[in-house]
Amino acid sequence: MMSHSHYDPYNTDHSYATKVAMECRMIAQAWGHNPGEKVLGAPQLYLFEPHQSEQMQWKPDTFLDITDVWDKKRAAIECMQGQEHLWNFYTNLAENRGNHFRRNSGGMAGGRPARYAEGFQSVYPRTVDEL
């Protein structure tokens, strides 16, 4: 699941959408919420990066390599004619997150060569089999 940051003073509808996503997740994994119905499980909820991450109290903890789909993403961004001022902003951001991806996947020690990446903030703890 993906949604907006928890807090966004410029787009309050974004915060509301995240609250709805969190409620849907809660219901999907709640034993006894709807007796007789299958429990769907508890997927992670990732919050994608807002325009002003430092104002939204958003901190990335997950990076996704989007190099293979960057051209399509850039073309999609350019479809929003009213936000032309953000086209280069998002290109620069994807390149910066690509650097974060490379550094956190091993960097000079054999890290994966992502040119473009996106950052996400996970809401819930993740489970692992080993550290």
Model features per residue range: what roles?
Residues 1-131:
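Metal-dependent de-N-acetylase/amidase catalytic core
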